């Protein structure tokens, strides 16, 4: 099935209306949950760093920033590694170790930390590339049935609700891989297949530009 512009717009409104619930703050979470989550995070530190900022092995693997994310979104991602709707051979063994309670606790722990960018990447894109990425993020390209990223991911793409994460301050190589995973259907855990449909319409140049622009932005929205 192919969404036409009007149909896709309706789908976007449905998803953002149904899923844009308020993010759980650390103040609303029992301290015992955060303590247990911190203990579980010992499994995550080697790849995602103690700060949750993420890390990378150039040309091999790119580990995302975990902070600044809705905890329910995080739980869904871990569960997806377990059930195979998101494939990553490094993550699956760790995901398989976690109980439902541990997934809940570690996700809330990372959600309670300050959102910080990894320091092991640089954005070397030209101004033209960054401008192209920004245009797609804010305006999309309806001639190709590509909605703006902010239509789902909220103001300045800093995330909204439990299904649309904060996209900013991630390693551009990680963002490129994530989009290509949807294109190649090695990741199928997005609601209504919205990301898969969008990803398949993006060119490699589009993906590079979007990833570069997002990586150039701060991990948390500046006031």
Model-assigned labels for residue ranges:
Residues 2-12:
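Bacterial N-terminal signal peptides that target proteins for export
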Residues 10-22:
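Bacterial N-terminal signal peptides
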Residues 24-41, 54-55, 60, 114-142:
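Electrostatic cytochrome c docking/interface patches
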Residues 37, 42-50, 106, 146-156, ...:
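The canonical Cys-X-X-Cys-His
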Residues 59-134:
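Acidic (E/D-rich), amphipathic helical modules within compact regulatory domains
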Residues 96-120, 132, 173, 198-223:
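C-terminal capping alpha-helices of c-type cytochrome domains
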């Amino acid at each position: 099935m192919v969404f036409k512009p009007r149909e896709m717009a309706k789908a976007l409104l449905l998803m953002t209306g149904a899923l844009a619930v308020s993010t759980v703050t650390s103040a609303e979470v029992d301290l015992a949950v955060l303590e247990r989550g911190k203990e579980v995070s010992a499994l995550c530190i080697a790849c995602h760093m103690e700060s949750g900022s993420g890390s990378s092995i150039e040309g091999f693997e790119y580990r995302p920033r975990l902070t600044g994310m809705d905890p329910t979104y995080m739980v869904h991602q871990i569960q997806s590694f377990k059930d195979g709707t998101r494939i990553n051979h490094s993550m699956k063994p760790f995901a398989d170790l976690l109980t439902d309670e541990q997934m809940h606790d570690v996700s809330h722990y990372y959600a309670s930390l300050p959102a910080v960018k990894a320091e092991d990447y640089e954005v070397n894109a030209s101004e033209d590339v960054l401008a192209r990425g920004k245009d797609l993020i804010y305006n999309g390209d309806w001639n190709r049935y590509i909605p703006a990223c902010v239509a789902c991911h909220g103001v300045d793409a800093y995330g909204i609700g439990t299904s649309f994460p904060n996209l900013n301050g991630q390693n551009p190589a990680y963002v490129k891989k994530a989009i290509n995973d949807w294109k190649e259907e090695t990741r199928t855990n997005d609601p209504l297949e919205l990301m898969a449909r969008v990803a398949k319409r993006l060119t490699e140049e589009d993906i590079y530009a979007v990833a570069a622009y997002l990586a150039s932005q701060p991990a948390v929205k500046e006031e």
